[in-house]
């Protein structure tokens, strides 16, 4: 018998990291330089989700570039939010659109671009990009 840990059964308590991921939401704080245009580049190299058709895991690097307005995103919250996709059945295209929509709702940036660079599967490599510009910008 192996000594490797196994997933908890319903009777076992949920691990603290799993609780943090389940509660994961995008949190913001005031932009320290409102009124100044500057770019924030964030790379999330360990993104995972599940294929909605096969159930196989998908892996990607998510690139997030934005120009903040009045708020910036807290990085630990962003990490937990992204980790919440791990067991979710979602297409590559929908991943990028959901992340973009949630990011815009939380941070209301002047401009934002989300790029999902998904690892090749079956000799096919896919990159999905979506953008948003704040109205009136």
Swiss-Prot record:
Family matches, as HAMAP family: QueF_type1 (MF_00818)
Which domain of life does the protein's organism represent? Bacteria
Return the protein name: NADPH-dependent 7-cyano-7-deazaguanine reductase
Tell me the gene name. queF
Q: Which family does it belong to?
A: Belongs to the GTP cyclohydrolase I family. QueF type 1 subfamily.
Alphabetized NCBIfam families for the sequence: QueF-II
The GO biological-process annotations, alphabetized, read as: queuosine biosynthetic process; tRNA modification
User: GO molecular-function annotation terms?
Assistant: preQ1 synthase activity
Q: Where is the active site?
A: 51, 58
